[in-house]
Design a protein with these regions (language model features):
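Contiguous beta-strand/loop segments that form the cofactor/metal-binding neighborhood of enzyme cores
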Residues: 174-247, 270-280, 296-299, 312-314
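Active-site loop of classical SDR/Rossmann-like NAD(P)-dependent oxidoreductases
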Residues: 14, 242-244, 257-270, 283
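Rossmann-fold dehydrogenase core element
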Residues: 100-118, 136-140
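N-terminal Rossmann-like dinucleotide-binding module
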Residues: 1-43, 271
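Beta-loop-alpha module in the N-terminal Rossmann-like domain of NAD(P)-dependent dehydrogenases
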Residues: 44-105
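Predominantly a Rossmann-like dinucleotide-binding segment in NAD(P)-dependent oxidoreductases
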Residues: 119-188
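C-terminal helix-rich "cap/oligomerization" subdomain common to oxidoreductases
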Residues: 1, 52, 62-65, 211, ...
């Protein structure tokens, strides 16, 4: 069987750092084009827009859409209408309701729509799910704090309406949470902290639960400097189970159970190749529904202005 010929649309940091090496490392996948207004990749055909690429570019089977979520829906719809398989970076769209028409369009065209959650493919996530299946969980604490200036340098879109703000990384934690816990979850309380010069939150504190009343506390913050925190602690009757470093490590109490190399995006592309071989879609909106809950229920708090270039004090 020939390789799945993939084009990347939107060639920013995540595409360059994660998608390109993952495609290169995935059997049955090859990168044949890039569409981006501002960036290119040596040795790969480049086009300024996806429309130009579809019209004048090489034969492609699929597109990986890596542009900001605010503009993803229209590009996804155009690619599906052209009969191309579509991979959506997370979050799949700027809103929840805009995804259903894309699912219908993929079904009608007989192609794959894959809404990706890369953190679910972290090496410790599935072992954690299996371990927790035999435990009674009493409470969950999520601490997901990072420095936006390091991970999204100069990317103003992330603080625009529809850019998700701190929920751009925070949704990674929610994607893990909704994978490892067996019951549907919902937000019961949210405090959202908006810089007074921005349209999306820079920090958020959430209370989440399930129908059995499991208490889950999530703290997201884009202002953390120094060591970064991507941890989920499950307190069980048999002791704590902790996912750390975004799901790279798993601790059962003090015992390190999993400590593996990151291969999240390779996992995504293996899944994409498999889905496209069967023209099947994979669209789970549970993580984004929790974000929508947070914006619906959230109390807004105004905090200091944010600029990507930190103020230098004399």
């Amino acid at each position: 069987m020939s390789d799945l010929r993939i084009a990347i649309v939107g060639f920013g940091k995540i595409a360059r750092d994660q998608h390109v090496p993952a495609i290169a490392a995935t059997p049955g996948a090859s990168l044949v084009a890039v569409a981006s207004r501002n960036a290119s990749l040596p040795g790969v055909p480049h086009f300024r827009t996806m429309a130009e690429m579809l019209r004048d570019g090489p034969a492609i089977d699929a597109v990986a859409l890596c542009m900001p979520p605010q503009v993803r829906r229209t590009e996804a719809a155009a690619a599906l209408a052209a009969g191309k398989h579509v991979m959506l970076e997370k979050p799949p769209g700027a809103s929840v309701s805009e995804i259903a028409p894309l699912v219908a369009a993929a079904d009608k065209a007989g192609v794959t729509l894959f809404a990706t959650w890369h953190s679910r493919y972290a090496p410790a996530v599935e072992p954690a799910r299996q371990l927790l299946a035999s435990r009674r969980i009493e409470q969950v604490t999520i601490t997901w704090k990072e420095d936006v200036r390091v991970w999204h340098p100069g990317q103003d879109w992330i603080f625009e309406a529809g850019g998700f703000g701190v929920f751009d990384p925070g949704i990674n934690a929610l994607s893990i949470l909704t994978r490892v816990l067996p019951q549907p979850l919902f937000v019961t309380k949210a405090d959202l902290h908006f810089p007074y010069n921005r349209a999306a939150p820079i920090a958020a504190d959430l209370d989440i639960s399930d129908m059995d009343g499991l208490p889950i506390r999530a703290e997201f913050d884009f202002r953390q400097t120094g060591p970064q925190s991507w941890d989920i602690r499950f307190d069980t009757t048999e002791g704590p189970v902790t996912l750390s470093l975004g799901g790279a490590k798993l601790f059962d109490g003090d015992t390190l159970v999993v400590d593996a190399k990151d291969a999240e995006y390779q996992g995504l592309y293996r899944r994409f190749v498999d889905l496209t071989s069967r023209a099947r879609s994979d669209v789970d909106l549970a993580p984004q529904l929790l974000v929508a809950d947070a914006f619906t229920l959230g109390q807004r708090h105004v905090v200091d202005a944010f600029e990507h270039k930190a103020e230098v004090k004399a």
